[in-house]
Amino acid sequence: MFGRQSGLGSSSNSSNLVEFRAGRMNMVGKMVHPDPRKGLVYMTQSDDGLMHFCWKDRTSGKVEDDLIVFPDDFEYKRVDQCKTGRVYVLKFKSSTRRMFFWMQEPKTDKDDEQCRRINELLNNPPSAHQRGGGGSNDGDLQYMLNNMSQQQLMQLFGGVGQMGGLSSLLGQMNSRTPSSRNTSSSGGGGASALQTPENVSVPRTPSAPSKSGSSRSSSNVNSQVGEGAGSSVDADAPGRSLNIDLSTALPGADAINQIIADPEHVKTLIVHLPESEDVDDDRKQQIKDNITSPQFQQALAQFSSALQSAQLGPVIKQFELSNEAVAAAFSGNLEDFVRALEKSLPPGATMGGKPSASEKKASDPETPTSVARDENTDPATEKQEEKQK
């Protein structure tokens, strides 16, 4: 989920899938207080297929909340504890955040139906066919990614070390397109049918290129990459790797035990887990449980497919990674992408570890974190440290 600053506030009521008059409520401490303004809660689906949960001020017409929501990430329900009004809450399943609304419709007979409809749209958004728009083309995913800010992309990936939003998005696309896609080489070889998420075309394992084949030239591939085009690339095109599923690399007990046996790896990974006072062995088990969880494995598999579809180039480019990593993402080469990430690490570091002590010490004074920490140091503490020296 993430918010947008503008874009859907001018939508006419006819385009809204559900709408009703309701005001916002503000939380102060453990209490929520009603905002007296007249408001409207509505849900709509944009052209890229994403669902929006919105609240706007009916007097000014300004949309103050515009949230892009993904299936299974939210729940909308009535607050039964409130006896003085009709209060509903939008619960974020991935965090403790809550948004409260108080009904402003004069009649109560449609409250339950509107609540049911909100949850239906949150968890089962209509497909393009249901909206009467026909089948969506392979450019939909790339169009959507190109129009996201870096902050939205970060939240789509669910933050560092998580990929909940991307998993939900690709899973939603997969449910809309149960049919398989055929990918064949330009030489006329047999097609390989693959079950893939909609708009994510995963290449089949390429065969050795024929000398007399009419495979696409490197210049043509580079031209399409530069134009942001190419929702798929020929299987025989240079720069593509074998179809790799990252989720198959970690499930083995030996691989996971090797990761958690290294204290540096454990320190790197636990920062991405919920805070806990568990002892070291319990934290290792928590890491192991997360890596082997179906949710993580599914997200990892879907990221593998998405990157190898050559459609994540615009996403990777916004994270200001190396040119090699961006080029690998545009070409859909997962192996080159991982190698590029390894090259960009500080000397002595690995994909799962940290720099050596000497390297870390040399780089610390230049990091923003260190500067921020110095700026926030208590002056009294500094004087005491100087006396001790």
From Swiss-Prot:
The keyword Disulfide bond does not apply. Residues 237-351 form the DEUBAD domain. Residues 194-204 have a biased composition (Polar residues). Residues 16-124 form the PH domain. Keywords: Cytoplasm, Nucleus, Phosphoprotein, Proteasome. It is found in: Cytoplasm; Nucleus. Disulfide bonds: none annotated. Belongs to the ADRM1 family. This is Proteasomal ubiquitin receptor ADRM1 homolog. It comes from Drosophila melanogaster (Fruit fly). The lineage of its organism: Eukaryota, Metazoa, Ecdysozoa, Arthropoda, Hexapoda.
